[in-house]
Amino acid sequence: MPRKMYSCDFETTTKVEDCRVWAYGYMNIEDHSEYKIGNSLDEFMAWVLKVQADLYFHNLKFDGAFIINWLERNGFKWSADGLPNTYNTIISRMGQWYMIDICLGYKGKRKIHTVIYDSLKKLPFPVKKIAKDFKLTVLKGDIDYHKERPVGYEITPDEYAYIKNDIQIIAEALLIQFKQGLDRMTAGSDDLKGFKDIITTKKFKKVFPTLSLGLDKEVRYAYRGGFTWLNDRFKEKEIGEGMVFDVNSLYPAQMYSRLLPYGEPIVFEGKYVWDEDYPLHIQHIRCEFELKEGYIPTIQIKRSRFYKGNEYLKSSGGEIADLWVSNVDLELMKEHYDLYNVEYISGLKFKATTGLFKDFIDKWTHIKTTSEGAIKQLAKLMLNSLYGKFASNPDVTGKVPYLKENGALGFRLGEEETKDPVYTPMGVFITAWARYTTITAAQACFDRIIYCDTDSIHLTGTEIPDVIKDIVDPKKLGYWAHESTFKRAKYLRQKTYIQDIYMKEVDGKLVEGSPDDYTTIKFSVKCAGMTDKIKKEVTFENFKVGFSRKMKPKPVQVPGGVVLVDDTFTIK
């Protein structure tokens, strides 16, 4: 008999000295008529211990803290061995919560347990956005989170409806995923399973062999994220009119058409020599460098005492830089920099082909373009989650929760644990080609480029640049979509900028406009780590380094669970 599945949620008090659950709700994911809303954590946990089901909380990192507090105070201890009256967790080294597995015992060989998962790992969006984008039958409401609610507080009809809507939104969205066969713990795992189903597990193992941890470590040195860079010419200055273009599905586009690695790599010493059977390579290189005049910097060095990890460098500053780079990145380096005292140490070369992901991307692109609501959003998720799974870190050493002397949860690092890597070379080259796409387009617009962020270029002026004018389309895979045109803007640093965007009304909806047809201006604030509440305080006048507000909720572990306390957010 299959296990039942439930969507669950807590509502909690907001005072450090009185941290507790004042309301809970659960709903059967497959039968929405089976649900309950109550006001006692003890009552909820009594149900958890007997239900033997799979439960989903949206942001387990928050709600899970209350559950583990309760378990620790009621005789349960953490154990990885599946002993009766223990619980196990999957909490990453970085503090990401994935699972709580509560073991009650065994009936014969059958484990009697309830497992609690994080639906945020399968649906990485706020509940409000899920309800809207999936076009579900209910929408997220609102309540006064700071209202006084003493122990035994009676839930009002409005609060009851709010809680029911929250659990129903996640229940409906998860059910749609499960009906599509997307039943793994995370969106990335769903993607990888779906890809294996298309090419077969047998072929997957042949095409993407498991590399040794030592070899994977060397490959991983060349793995980097998206290209995010602000042109110093425009930093902290108010800018006039400009345009923003985004690549449609940047990473899937590289997976669809670019030359990508497969198979066992061959280690080589010194400098790579062209090999038509192994046309891709990762090169270990030492050098000094100086940025050429009129070129965008592309070298970023992390984990070094000489350089800032998030800064793209104009010079090696007289130091010898030690780099592992894909041949795609190396090509850009040589074009953008003068390299000195170059020493080619060693490297890895790979067989390569195109089209490995064609059937997978064709399938989900077709679903995306022919569907609406939930299925369309799922297709977007499936298209964008797979590439990262290939570069999953094999070091899965996690954190273990415990109760500190003050009664709050603490976390210690668990025993070292590793798993087989998937195939990191694929992640290296997909992301390298993505950076290449963005950087080459930005470089071709050097006189106009303000800012790049992974899949986007922000330009001065309102003319489509020649480099992309023939590949502008709102939907085509890998084409550049015209995201917006702004009247004025101000950029302070990476992921920190504001814009006045031209908008117009079409069929009762506001859409992006132009200087010629706009009917209104939309003020847009993009700032990593800034809450919506703080964004309402931002103006062109006060948006500068040093802007500060004590309005950012910060989760703090306290006896009983977690409380969000107001912390200071400052633009540095």
UniProtKB/Swiss-Prot annotation:
It catalyses: DNA(n) + a 2'-deoxyribonucleoside 5'-triphosphate = DNA(n+1) + diphosphate. The keyword Isomerase does not apply. The record marks S119 as: Critical for 3'-5' exonucleolysis. SMART domains: POLBc. 5-methyl-UTP binds at Y251, K368, K380, D455. The record marks I90 as: Involved in binding template-primer structures. The record marks D9, E11, F62, S119, L120 as: Essential for 3'-5' exonucleolysis. GO terms for molecular function: DNA binding; DNA-directed DNA polymerase activity; exonuclease activity; metal ion binding; nucleoside binding; nucleotide binding. Mg(2+) 1 binds at D142, D166. It holds the Pfam family DNA_pol_B_2. The record marks K526 as: Stabilizes the primer-terminus at the polymerization active site and contributes to the coordination between the exonuclease and polymerazation activities. Residues 227-572 are annotated as: Initiation, polymerization and pyrophosphorolytic activities. Its cofactor is Mg(2+). Residues 223-226 are annotated as: DNA-binding. Residues 1-222 are annotated as: 3'-5' exonuclease and strand displacement activities. Its EC number is 2.7.7.7, 3.1.11.-. GO terms for biological process: DNA replication; viral DNA genome replication. The record marks S249, N384, G388, T431, R435, K495, Y497 as: Probably involved in binding template-primer structures. This DNA polymerase requires a protein as a primer. Belongs to the DNA polymerase type-B family. Polymerase responsible for protein-primed viral DNA replication by strand displacement with high processivity and fidelity. The N-terminus contains the 3'-5' exonuclease activity and strand displacement ability. The C-terminus contains the protein-primed initiation, DNA polymerization and pyrophosphorolytic activities. PANTHER family: DNA POLYMERASE, DNA-DIRECTED DNA POLYMERASE. This is DNA polymerase. The lineage of its organism: Viruses, Duplodnaviria, Heunggongvirae, Uroviricota, Caudoviricetes.
